[in-house]
């Protein structure tokens, strides 16, 4: 159906092209190099980092609820870093579900150009490791991981206000936008899954580039 629709559009444009079929697209997907465009922040970069899971094998939630868990369910883990100012995705990494968040932070930071200054990195407690602290020190960022000692000293509410931890809600919103494009991966090959994710990230950045709503607190 989709192939016929695309072929009709090509014909209306007066082009002598042939619409590729689904099999051809699937085979060529893993060889496509998708570039994710973005806009730089006016000031220093404040990077918000988080991860989520995407299913690529197994039945839906309704069948699992009615007929007990599906043992063949498999997941990929998506790690992203977004700009707190532009809300565009600046770093993305797809891994297997047995890779911890702290192991991927270095790969995410490496995707940020070395000549671009990173003011701070906002993460959750999963990144509160010695290795992650060293990675942030190497890039001269102000580490914003959960610090239990400071929380106990000042209280959780004051600590969140002082550290700016509430900004992490922005990356949670971006995760929701990603899931709106699909909460599972259609490709089975890992390289194809990476390209599928990069395509989604490129689309989301284009949408974000069109503009964000302006909000104002009403009291």
Predicted features along the sequence, with ranges:
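Short arginine-rich
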Residues: 13-16, 206-207
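Catalytic-loop motifs flanking and including active-site residues across diverse enzymes
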Residues: 101-104, 170, 174, 198
């Amino acid at each position: 159906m989709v192939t016929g629709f695309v072929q009709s559009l090509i014909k209306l444009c007066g082009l002598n092209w042939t619409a590729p079929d689904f099999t051809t697209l699937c085979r060529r997907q893993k060889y496509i190099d998708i570039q994710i465009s973005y806009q730089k922040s006016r000031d220093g970069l404040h990077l918000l980092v988080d991860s989520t899971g995407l299913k690529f094998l197994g039945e839906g939630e309704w069948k699992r609820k009615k007929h007990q868990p599906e043992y063949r369910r498999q997941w990929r883990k998506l790690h992203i870093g977004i700009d707190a100012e532009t809300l565009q995705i600046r770093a993305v990494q797809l891994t297997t579900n047995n890779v911890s968040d702290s192991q991927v932070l270095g790969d995410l930071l490496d995707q940020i150009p070395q000549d671009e200054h990173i003011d701070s990195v906002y993460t959750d407690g999963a990144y509160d490791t010695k290795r992650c602290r060293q990675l942030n020190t190497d890039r001269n960022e102000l580490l914003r991981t959960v610090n239990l000692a400071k929380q106990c000293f000042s209280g959780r509410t004051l600590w969140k206000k002082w550290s700016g931890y509430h900004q992490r809600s922005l990356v949670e919103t971006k995760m929701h936008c990603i899931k709106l494009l699909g909460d599972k991966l259609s490709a089975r090959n890992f390289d194809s899954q990476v390209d599928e994710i990069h395509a989604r990230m490129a689309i989301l950045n284009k949408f974000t580039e069109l503009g964000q709503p302006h909000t104002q607190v009403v009291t």
